[in-house]
């Protein structure tokens, strides 16, 4: 009897020691990076806390910043093989970091840990390069119009349904409200996307010819592109870059003319609209506007893209655990509840079901309503990620400044942008 008890005690002790040794070996340390504002930081930290409760052997170190400097920091990390295990990434980074699909870990390899069935295959296709899934799109977003309801009412105008109505609104704002009032304010990246929409409606062709690694527009069409910009500025539809620059370099939604309603609308991602609306002087709020369409247009020319993605670093030593973390954030009850709509209306089917049931997703919410409207518009023509290349966007910003500061004519600017842009595209697509 004593021997049996002794054997049992020895076996139990060995099992306990074995379990402790296994637990110690099984401890995993992950790093996760993202950018955003304080609201995004807080909900993501809460979600990581919940993940650790369910997986106490997995520690996640959070590396979060604002937008400024985030890309350059990540570029250095990726080049040195020191990137985080899990990263919030942008869709237009795929051509920069992963031209052949090997720049990020292939998520098709961790299907056991990551429930890909919750995502529309069409959306996953956008983030797949050479058959390798480089990121899970968290949500999709589109640029659409939102207007300051109080200021537009004061101007006595209905929200523009056509391009002509948009162009005519500037004169009314100037005459009725004063020279400092504009129907919309657009930063250079917003302007680039808006005029592309107009050109797509008119010509039904893509902006970039990926097969030939250059722009698809003719020289005459580029002149028309920049003429449209100058027309909007001349018609007082939007402030020039020169006037805009006089208010400093802070975020547009933190500038005084935005807060007090002098800039009475924007063409913005539906997923980010809350922070723009929250900064308005109450009781003013942003409301969704119609989308201007040219007669007979077959495509709205919307800029649709994944709002952000979650990717796994190609250098990770823990791909399975990294995939578990992504799955928790996007598909689990606790992760979905913690993140809410901070990164837009989620693409995960189970997340949408949960958030609708809990009343978080409401069709009248400006962000949700904006996405629903965008999805109803004709939008078969996809946007090339090269259109959103940081160098192309920066080049456009320089180009319209040349016009606003009188340094180049529209014709000269069109030629300059076409020539320099083709060079950028050729290098980027090598």
Regions found by a protein language model. Give the residues of each.
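A structural signal for short loop-to-beta-strand junctions that line the ligand-binding cleft
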Residues: 84-85, 114-151, 182-183, 298-302, ...
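Hinge/lid segment of periplasmic solute-binding proteins
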Residues: 91-143, 167, 285-289, 363, ...
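Glycine-centered hinge/linker elements that transmit conformational signals in sensory
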Residues: 170-171, 214-246, 291-294
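Mature extracytoplasmic/periplasmic domains
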Residues: 103-109, 271-278, 291, 308, ...
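C-terminal capping/gating helix-and-loop segments adjacent to ligand/active sites or protein-protein/ligand interfaces
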Residues: 368-420
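Extracytoplasmic "Venus flytrap"
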Residues: 29-46, 65, 141, 384-388
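Short, well-ordered beta-strand elements
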Residues: 26-37, 58-63, 85-86, 134, ...
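Extracytoplasmic/periplasmic solute-binding protein
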Residues: 134-138, 143, 167-222
């Amino acid at each position: 009897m004593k021997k049996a008890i002794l054997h049992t005690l020895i076996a139990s002790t060995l099992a306990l020691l074995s379990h402790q040794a296994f637990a110690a070996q099984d401890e995993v340390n992950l790093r996760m990076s993202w950018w955003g504002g304080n609201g995004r930081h807080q909900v993501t930290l809460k979600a990581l806390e919940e993940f650790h409760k369910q997986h106490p052997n997995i520690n996640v170190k959070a590396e979060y910043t604002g937008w400024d400097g985030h890309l350059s920091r990540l570029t250095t990390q990726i080049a040195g093989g020191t990137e985080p295990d899990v990263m919030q990434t942008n869709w237009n980074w795929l051509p920069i970091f992963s031209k052949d699909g090997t720049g990020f870990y292939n998520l098709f390899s961790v299907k056991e840990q990551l429930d890909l069935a919750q995502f529309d295959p069409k959306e996953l296709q956008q983030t797949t390069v050479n058959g390798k899934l480089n990121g899970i799109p968290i949500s999709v977003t589109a640029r659409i119009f939102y207007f300051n309801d109080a200021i537009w009412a004061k101007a006595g105008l209905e929200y523009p349904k056509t391009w002509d109505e948009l162009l005519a609104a500037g004169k009314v704002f100037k005459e009725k409200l004063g020279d400092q009032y504009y129907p919309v304010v657009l930063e250079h990246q917003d302007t680039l996307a808006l005029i592309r929409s107009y050109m797509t409606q008119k010509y039904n062709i893509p902006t970039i010819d990926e097969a030939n690694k250059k722009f698809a527009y003719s020289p005459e069409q580029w002149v028309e592109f920049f003429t449209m910009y100058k027309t909007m500025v001349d018609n007082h539809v939007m402030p020039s870059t020169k006037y805009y620059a006089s208010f400093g370099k802070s975020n547009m939604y933190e500038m005084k003319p935005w807060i007090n309603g002098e800039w009475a609308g924007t063409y913005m991602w539906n997923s980010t609209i809350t922070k723009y609306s929250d900064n308005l002087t109450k009781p003013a709020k942003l409301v969704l506007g119609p989308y201007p369409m040219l007669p007979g247009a077959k495509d709205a020319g919307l800029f649709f893209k994944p709002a952000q993605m979650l990717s796994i670093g190609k250098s990770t030593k823990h791909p399975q655990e990294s995939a578990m973390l992504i799955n928790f954030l996007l598909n689990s009850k606790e992760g979905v509840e913690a993140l809410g709509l901070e990164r837009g209306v989620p693409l995960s089917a189970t997340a949408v079901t949960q958030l609708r049931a809990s009343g978080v997703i409401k069709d009248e919410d400006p962000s949700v309503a904006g996405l629903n409207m965008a999805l109803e518009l004709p939008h078969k023509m996809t946007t090339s990620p090269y259109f959103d290349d940081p160098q192309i966007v920066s080049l456009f910003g320089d180009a319209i400044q040349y016009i606003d500061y009188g340094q180049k004519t529209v014709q000269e600017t069109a030629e300059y942008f076409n020539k320099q842009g083709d060079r950028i595209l050729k290098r980027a697509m090598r």
